[in-house]
């Protein structure tokens, strides 16, 4: 059996939680050119753009849990990926009731 991943206090402090406008989702397909198809918790599939701050620093894979900020226009179809959660952060989100989707 593997070791249980323990979430440290500084990882919780650095973690970005969803606000009223943001939605959690699962990265379904990588489309290239910094675009990802994301299935969001509100039932919509959005074509999301990886924002410039994350492009080369954070690599998103299929099945990752991400935080999406829908655009002001075309909010049901488009959005920006603003955060990717690590595995232990996803477990914390599930325990606290933020995440109901299965990856």
Predicted regions and their residues:
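Short nucleic-acid-contacting surface segments enriched for D/E, G, S/T with interspersed K/R
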Residues: 54-67
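Short, structured beta-strand/loop micro-motifs enriched in basic residues and often containing a Trp
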Residues: 42-52
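Flexible glycine-/small-residue-rich
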Residues: 29, 40, 70, 83-85
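N-terminal, positively charged regions that mediate nucleic acid binding
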Residues: 21-32
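Short boundary/loop segments of OB/S1/cold-shock single-stranded nucleic-acid-binding domains
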Residues: 1-23
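OB-fold/S1-family single-stranded nucleic acid-binding modules
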Residues: 72-99
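Long, charged, low-complexity intrinsically disordered regions
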Residues: 2-7, 93-103
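Short aromatic-glycine-enriched beta-strand elements
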Residues: 33-38
